[in-house]
Amino acid sequence: MSVNPLTLKIASPYARALFDFSVEKNIMHQITADFQNLEIFLKENTELTEYLDNPVVSKNAKCEILAKTLQAQLNDETLKFLMILVERGRISLLTSVITIYLELVYETASIKTIEVSTAFEFTTSQKTILVQKLKELMNAREIRLMITVDPNLIGGFLIKTQSKVIDFTIKNQLQKLAKHLDTVLEI
């Protein structure tokens, strides 16, 4: 996920404050579940995100739509936090706040989030094997896979962690072969 560094700098204190609050009040699991569901909901309902990001829409209207849309699904504290973001004019940072908050939770729980791009959908057994290997490689208690299917990779898969990129794609192998042939044929 490529996010503007300024956005991260502004969103981080909100995520950190909510994280600290959730630990203090012993509601981290509820807020984490809310944010995991909210992350999916916002991706599927781009109209809501656009509405909340619109500077012309009043703060009261934004609070009202959040309450009507999400009150039944969210913990009271999560909803209050969203209202604070609206009141402070920071609701447009919601997706970044969610991402940072979840990273803090996963880091605390020794859960690593790993992006995997694949040419074809993994089977259940392939996912299980991949998770086991990644747990060993990353020294993590749990692995959270974020899988995207990209037919342009031709075959294989690409693994992205915070510090590493491991490329097992056929596309990459073909590019390496082409470079090698270019250097060999130039001689």
UniProtKB/Swiss-Prot annotation:
It holds the Pfam family OSCP. F(1)F(0) ATP synthase produces ATP from ADP in the presence of a proton or sodium gradient. F-type ATPases consist of two structural domains, F(1) containing the extramembraneous catalytic core and F(0) containing the membrane proton channel, linked together by a central stalk and a peripheral stalk. During catalysis, ATP synthesis in the catalytic domain of F(1) is coupled via a rotary mechanism of the central stalk subunits to proton translocation. This protein is part of the stalk that links CF(0) to CF(1). It either transmits conformational changes from CF(0) to CF(1) or is implicated in proton conduction. PANTHER family: ATP SYNTHASE DELTA CHAIN. GO terms for cellular component: chloroplast thylakoid membrane; proton-transporting ATP synthase complex. It is a peripheral membrane protein. It is found in: Plastid, Chloroplast thylakoid membrane. HAMAP family: ATP_synth_delta_bact. Belongs to the ATPase delta chain family. This is ATP synthase subunit delta, chloroplastic. GO terms for molecular function: proton-transporting ATP synthase activity, rotational mechanism. F-type ATPases have 2 components, F(1) - the catalytic core - and F(0) - the membrane proton channel. F(1) has five subunits: alpha(3), beta(3), gamma(1), delta(1), epsilon(1). CF(0) has four main subunits: a(1), b(1), b'(1) and c(10-14). The alpha and beta chains form an alternating ring which encloses part of the gamma chain. F(1) is attached to F(0) by a central stalk formed by the gamma and epsilon chains, while a peripheral stalk is formed by the delta, b and b' chains. InterPro entries: ATP_synth_OSCP/delta_N_sf, ATPase_OSCP/dsu. It comes from the Eukaryota. Disulfide bonds: none annotated. Its main location: plastid. Keywords: ATP synthesis, CF(1), Chloroplast, Hydrogen ion transport, Ion transport, Membrane, Plastid, Thylakoid, Transport.
